[in-house]
Amino acid sequence: MSKYKLIMLRHGEGAWNKENRFCSWVDQKLNSEGMEEARNCGKQLKALNFEFDLVFTSVLNRSIHTAWLILEELGQEWVPVESSWRLNERHYGALIGLNREQMALNHGEEQVRLWRRSYNITPPPIEESHPYYHEIYNDRRYKVCDVPLDQLPRSESLKDVLERLLPYWNERIAPEVLRGKTVLISAHGNSSRALLKHLEGISDEDIINITLPTGVPILLELDENLRAVGPHQFLGDQEAIQAAIKKVEDQGKVKQAKK
């Protein structure tokens, strides 16, 4: 029986989403389409009369800005927002900045699918020579984390994402939900997938089939033990949402040349 409701989402579209590049921990901002997605998400939640008590985001701009735009549409700008690196996107290591379609051409679509969607396959780690290494690890936000800088990931599988996310869920977010607070989590594709895996009990094998579009609110109904009582629900125009899911799934495929 449903006792609690949780809303989560993947942030709105950013420039590198549109360019089909692995963004990961690079602090790309929302583009105009992403801002519109966030505003539409806020309108959708307003139409359903959601009133939030707390918002949780990653420390990346696109996650935080999405939350701000949603709260603005709701007229709930005063709601506290808390940010943690533990909700960050998956660290894609050496793949950061690379184009997914080009990677599919170089390594095959199945390898790219495994890097993007599988549970326990880790991409090659980022090295100091990587063009975005210093931009990430010299950033002040990572010098005030709850772990030392040298213990932050250099690459992650989805399993790794879940392992660094769970302590934050268990110690910070879950207690607020259990107190009856209405919580919004504005995160990323893979941190959201990892949390869905945990709450819904999705198997290691089946998680590869879970795809989340940008800027679409997801409703989870939870029991007294904070386990999902049914599958997650995308809120909004279902036909448009399915088209958006397919768009994400196709990012790691080689487009057919026009005749």
From Swiss-Prot:
PROSITE patterns attached to this UniProt entry: PG_MUTASE (PS00175)
Annotated catalytic residues: 11, 89
Modified residues (N-acetylserine): 2
Enzyme class, first EC level, given as a word: isomerase
GO MF annotations in UniProt: bisphosphoglycerate mutase activity; hydrolase activity; phosphoglycerate mutase activity
Gene3D superfamilies from the UniProt entry: Phosphoglycerate mutase-like
Regulation: At alkaline pH BPGM favors the synthase reaction; however, at lower pH the phosphatase reaction is dominant. Inhibited by citrate.
Keyword terms of this UniProt record: Acetylation, Glycolysis, Hydrolase, Isomerase, Phosphoprotein
Quaternary data: Homodimer.
Name the UniProt record assigns to this protein: Bisphosphoglycerate mutase
Organism of this sequence: Macaca fascicularis (Crab-eating macaque)
